[in-house]
Amino acid sequence: MEASTVRTQDHYVTFGRREGDEDFPNSLISGISTFLGAQVIPPVRDRLEEAEVKAAVLGLPWEGTNTCRPGASYGPRSIRRATEHYLSYHGEFQVDLFDALNLTDCGDVSIVPGNARRTFDRAERCITEIVEAGAFPIIFGGDDSCPIPVTSAMSKLIEGKMGYIQMDSHMDTAEAVAGETLNHACPVSRTAELPNVDGHNVALVGINGPLNPRVEREYVDRTGIQMVTIWDIDEWGIDKTIERVLEIAWDGTDGVVLHTDLDVLDQGFTTGVTTPETGGLTPREVIKMIRAFVRQGVDAYVITECSSVYDPANKAARVATRLALDALGVRANPAGTGRV
């Protein structure tokens, strides 16, 4: 009689072993690809509550408003594949993410091709179900319009004022692009318009380069949005930068949404992004900031612009994976040192 084994959380599914045979789980070449090999539960509140899920990932493979290099819709799948190189035990926080958070993969939002509004409505419903189940959501885009449904959903779920941090080389404060208000250049403006968001609680971190139009800077100045440029970071150092961003986003707010556009990193580290920029942050600098922000208390985290079609080594997806795993590590063990 041959045995069958299904152990998604251990990164693999194998069949054909005989009873008592030893098995070697190699997630790089076998198994069903979920985030870190996590169990799959749809974004349905009752199902997530029943499983006592404390953290869940959700893919939003949407790039229907992108005006730059394509490929970000492959981001969620690329990131899941990149997690095959990692363990559920995070040695720097001395915690197993499955044991501590019952980490779950909620799959992907069902995209409506060509229709941003309907796609974002679906995304909002999924995010709402996850949060109302008591789980911390990490959302993988998708282009830079993907934070729009995240902040929209969270603004309704957070009782009180909401802060927003966008780590990005670009301001993304366009009010519209060719008349379209859900464009990938508009996530910050759409967020700043929410009824419980004030501009002075919105932090743009890492802004740099010549792809920041005058009209977007005028919007920043007009609305009181706080901008921390790459040159501010260069002058202040990471620790002072973190202090400044904490002051901005948590000043009188009751919840904060964090967004990392992978192009905030120098393109030498993240080749596979939609809008690469030279002169950005290093992975270590971004990791340190992510840890500090999540430790302070982030209610949702979204990562965008992973476009593996330009990245044979899958570097951007691996960076995204590391950022997500460190955010989860802090959630699982806030008192952890973050060192092996």
Outline where the language-model segments fall.
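Conserved alpha-helical scaffold segments that buttress catalytic/binding sites
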Residues: 2-340
